[in-house]
Amino acid sequence: MKNSESLKEFKKLNSDQITEKIDQLRKDLFDLRFKQATRQLNETHKFKIIKKQVAQLLTLSKSQSASQTTSD
């Protein structure tokens, strides 16, 4: 259920907000990798969640840009 809720929230964002969210999630992913390398990470499931959210946001971003291109 939580994933579908986050997808609904992502669809409400504009292109600038999507870009900011992608940057933030990529930073979080970097931090997780760093913690894993230093053996401080206990919640390894977050990798999958963040990667999925980045993919969803990239898909939304591309679909929004495609719809803007066709409408122009």
Swiss-Prot record:
Keyword line: Ribonucleoprotein, Ribosomal protein
GO molecular function, one term: structural constituent of ribosome
GO cellular component: cytosolic large ribosomal subunit
UniProt cross-references to InterPro entries, sorted A to Z: Ribosomal_protein_uL29 (IPR050063), Ribosomal_uL29 (IPR001854), Ribosomal_uL29_sf (IPR036049)
Keyword Ribosomal protein annotated: yes
GO biological-process terms attached to the record: translation
Pfam families: Ribosomal_L29 (PF00831)
Entries under PANTHER family matching the protein: 60S RIBOSOMAL PROTEIN L35/50S RIBOSOMAL PROTEIN L29, LARGE RIBOSOMAL SUBUNIT PROTEIN UL29C
HAMAP family in the record: Ribosomal_uL29
NCBIfam families linked: L29 (TIGR00012)
Entry similarity comment: Belongs to the universal ribosomal protein uL29 family.
Protein name: Large ribosomal subunit protein uL29
